[in-house]
Amino acid sequence: IFAALLTAAVAETFACTNLIVGKNASTDGSTIVSYSADSYGLFGELYHYPAATYPKGTMMDIHEWDTGKYLGQIEQARQTYNVIGNMNEFQVTIGETTFGGRPELVDTLGIIDYGSLIYVGLQRSRTAREAIKVMTELVQEYGYYSSGESFTIADPNEIWIMEMIGQG
């Protein structure tokens, strides 16, 4: 009976896994983060966003990460950093795990979803703390479109967990 219940629970789970090791827990003082999308059908893809300089006033289209739905535009940063996968040129890395939440808490007018928040955050940050600042400022200005997420945000010196859910 236990195995059947466990199988049923796992079959309906759409989650991600982050393993986090801080500097004081690793033998060589490294921070270590791994991230995987555990949901069936979400296979690893390696995205590349090259570093760039943009004229003041340039706008950036935001599309929902999971569906491609157009959500709106945000102001582009004047300078962005090179991002490959979920890490940028300064070794800032961001992963996530979805915890969902009540549907009425999703901001249907928000422009920033969890996936866009990860990659825009990586393009604009030199440290984990700066990524947290960038991410929170983006959702304060443009609204947060997704359900509940737990973000793992790391750099070579520290690792943070930031949870976010919409206000409805």
Language model region names:
Residues 16-114, 134-168:
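A contiguous strand-loop segment
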Residues 1-4:
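Sec-dependent signal peptide recognition
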Residues 106-108, 116-125:
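Second-shell loop/turn segments in exported
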